[in-house]
Design a protein with these regions (language model features):
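Acidic di-acidic motifs
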Residues: 10-11, 113
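Two-component/phosphorelay signaling modules centered on CheY-like receiver
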Residues: 13-31
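Acidic, metal-coordinating helix/loop segments flanking the phosphotransfer/catalytic sites
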Residues: 32-50
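Short amphipathic alpha-helix used as the core "switch/output" element in two-component signaling
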Residues: 41, 62-77
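Active-site residues of response regulator receiver
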Residues: 54-55
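Alpha4 helix (beta4-alpha4-beta5 surface) of REC/receiver domains from two-component response regulators
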Residues: 61-65, 87-122
């Protein structure tokens, strides 16, 4: 049986490492990238079944810019995305509603960066 492949793109290296470790313990094949540029490079050799994407990294729109690149690539435009941020509450934006209402995105879920592993697993199961 093939493992499901997941690419995690996040500039929080501690969260990146702990999420990778958790998902590997659940038998996923995991690659990571600390920004969207590295993430796009990783897609040249790693073809994930799902991408976990931080929305706000070096810039507030970096995650959305990555999504635009992904949408224009026939190999990845249907890849499910779990989008996350730890900033939604602090900036007062309902990111979940904003993201899940964008029809042009592939299958997409939003989760808060809370370290809630069950919420993450539930989102993964729903999208795969």
């Amino acid at each position: 049986m093939n493992k499901n492949k997941i690419l995690i793109i996040d500039d929080d290296v501690d969260l990146l490492a702990s999420t990778k470790l958790f998902l590997k313990s659940k038998k996923f094949e995991v690659e990571t990238a600390i920004n969207s540029k590295i993430g796009l490079g990783t897609l040249k050799t790693f073809h994930p079944d799902l991408i976990i994407l931080d929305i706000m990294m070096d810039t507030n729109l970096e995650g959305f810019n990555f999504l635009n690149e992904l949408k224009s690539d026939d190999n990845f435009k249907e890849t499910p995305i779990i989008m996350s941020t730890g900033m939604a509450k602090s900036i007062g934006v309902n990111m979940r509603a904003a993201i899940e209402d964008i029809d042009s995105l592939p299958k997409t879920k939003f989760i808060d960066k809370s370290g809630d592993w069950e919420e993450l697993l539930e989102a993964i199961k729903e999208l795969l």
